[in-house]
Amino acid sequence: MAEKVRDLRSALALLEQMPDQLIETEVEVDPMAELAGVYRYVGAGGTVKRPTKEGPAMIFNRIKGHPDAKVAIGLLASRKRVAALLDTQPENLGKMLCKSVENPIPPVDLEGDAPCQQVVHKAADPDFDLYKLVPAPTNTPDDAGPYITLGMCYATHPDTGVHDVTIHRLCTVSYTHL
């Protein structure tokens, strides 16, 4: 068995070892409709008509207008991949989810510098621009804007101070707002 998945890098490493589960391309793609179109035919295995077929996850290494960015798409698009990433079988995913909800793991506070904080962009910075920072794809010309489709939001309730992490589909609506 490969090393346990603990972050995006180890997840990609695992998928690379699995036949037909990850494709990487060096061909430049435009995040405006082209990226989603390529994935629709390669990763989703055809059109969006149901049933969507299972295809590989993809990494786009060259994004038009974003010379230092890559886009990973479809990492969680099949039960087979999700099960492999969680070191279980597809038929066990429901039970695993139920068990995790019933037995939450408390957060771990780490001392020192966090690797995820090596690069920090703040909306108050004069050159802050979400359109330049995030190569979020616009799936069709009719979309409201570029979407981060698996956006992780860390939020704090303004009155209680309770924190939570949630997953949302986030649309970039201005250079400072999602």
Question: Model-predicted segments: where are they?
Answer:
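Extended, highly charged
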Residues: 1-178
